[in-house]
């Protein structure tokens, strides 16, 4: 039975969640875990790049906060240089941001307005993972 649990855990999609706000990061990781995903965290865009480099075979989606040190925009383009097919969801408290519109044109997979509900995050993540 333990093997089945381990196997199921290994089959969980891995999501990298990056946010410089410690509370947002902690809550985001807990929500993703509650939704059945294996979640990795990063405190800024630079750390997100490092975590992705170390786990790029496993990471199925990266969620980037737009406004953080080494911001989401910069991290997005670095991630795309590393792996052009990486799926990225941008999270921001600013809905009308020109940078977000530009990222969507450049291949970003989605946008979610902060604060978001568990249901909103679940819909966005599952939609992107099933593309």
Ranges and model annotations:
Residues 20-22:
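Two-component His->Asp phosphorelay active-site signatures
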Residues 46-53, 73-85:
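Short amphipathic alpha-helix used as the core "switch/output" element in two-component signaling
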Residues 29, 41-61:
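Acidic, metal-coordinating helix/loop segments flanking the phosphotransfer/catalytic sites
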Residues 64-65:
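Active-site residues of response regulator receiver
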Residues 1-14:
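Disordered, acidic interdomain junction associated with two-component signaling
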Residues 26-34:
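Charged docking surfaces used in two-component/phosphorelay signaling
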Residues 42-43, 69-71:
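Hydrophobic residue at a beta-alpha junction
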Residues 74, 78-81, 89, 94-113, ...:
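Alpha4 helix (beta4-alpha4-beta5 surface) of REC/receiver domains from two-component response regulators
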């Amino acid at each position: 039975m333990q093997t089945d649990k381990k196997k199921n855990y290994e089959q969980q999609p891995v999501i990298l969640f990056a946010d410089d706000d410690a509370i947002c990061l902690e809550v985001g990781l807990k929500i993703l875990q509650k939704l059945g995903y294996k979640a990795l965290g990063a405190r800024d865009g630079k750390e997100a790049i490092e975590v992705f480099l170390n786990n790029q075979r496993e990471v199925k989606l990266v969620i980037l906060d737009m406004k953080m040190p080494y911001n989401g925009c910069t991290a997005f383009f670095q991630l795309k240089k590393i792996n052009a097919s990486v799926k990225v969801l941008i999270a921001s408290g600013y809905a009308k941001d020109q940078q977000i519109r530009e990222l969507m044109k450049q291949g970003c997979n989605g946008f979610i307005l902060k604060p978001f509900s568990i249901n909103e995050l679940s819909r966005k993540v599952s939609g992107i993972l099933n593309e």
